[in-house]
Amino acid sequence: MIDDTLLESEERMTQSVEYAREDLTTIRTGRANPSMFNGVQAEYYGVMTPITQMATISVPEPRMLLIKPYEPSIMNAIENAIRNSDLGVNPTNDGQVLRVTVPQLTEERRKEMVRLAKSKGEDARIAIRNIRRKGMDELKRIQKDGEAGEDEVQAAEKELDKTTHEYVSQVDKLIEAKEKELMEV
């Protein structure tokens, strides 16, 4: 029972860190990055489809993306989806590919993005701590029900605290790296 509780808590903490990592990739850094289009969808045969599944996206220059649709007929749909997204970029259509120039971020916008990254990091930390709290409650229940002794439960609580600290530290490193990336000019 104790091992199951620890394992389940660790799996959920891993999921929280992965979610935070993916969430942070959506924050624009002023550099061209194909993952900035992960949330953008365009209509494709009547179905909303991520543009990452409709085209190849490459980075020929640090601040430019090339989007080459698999079918030329969907060029306008992709172009409109990018224009209507909240990414703040404007694609140029040359008939074969879409060119997207990523504008340089202003200092104020960079600081705003850092605040957003820190906020997302704090959300991940809170999620990890909530997982810890649920794990601790479960360990106390196990002890109360007589399924494990006090020493075993205390050892498991220490292990859960150690695991929590490791995962919070991973989130801190992600935020630190994102902040460094954002503040680079």
UniProtKB/Swiss-Prot annotation:
Going by the UniProt record, its keywords in alphabetical order are: Cytoplasm, Protein biosynthesis
Task: Give one GO biological process term.
Answer: translational termination
Gene Ontology terms: cellular component: cytoplasm
Gene3D superfamilies linked: 3.30.1360.40, Ribosome-recycling factor
The protein's location, in the record's own words, is: Cytoplasm
Give the source's domain of life in one word: Bacteria
Which one of the record's GO molecular function terms can you name? Answer: ribosomal large subunit binding
Please name one Pfam family that this protein belongs to. RRF
Q: Does the keyword Protein biosynthesis apply?
A: yes
Principal localization? cytoplasm
The free-text function statement in the UniProt record for this protein reads: Responsible for the release of ribosomes from messenger RNA at the termination of protein biosynthesis. May increase the efficiency of translation by recycling ribosomes from one round of translation to another.
Q: Report the NCBIfam families cross-referenced here.
A: frr (TIGR00496)
For this protein, the record's HAMAP family field holds: RRF
Family note: Belongs to the RRF family.
What name goes with this protein? Ribosome-recycling factor
| Species whose genome carries this gene | Corynebacterium kroppenstedtii (strain DSM 44385 / JCM 11950 / CIP 105744 / CCUG 35717)
Gene name tied to this protein: frr
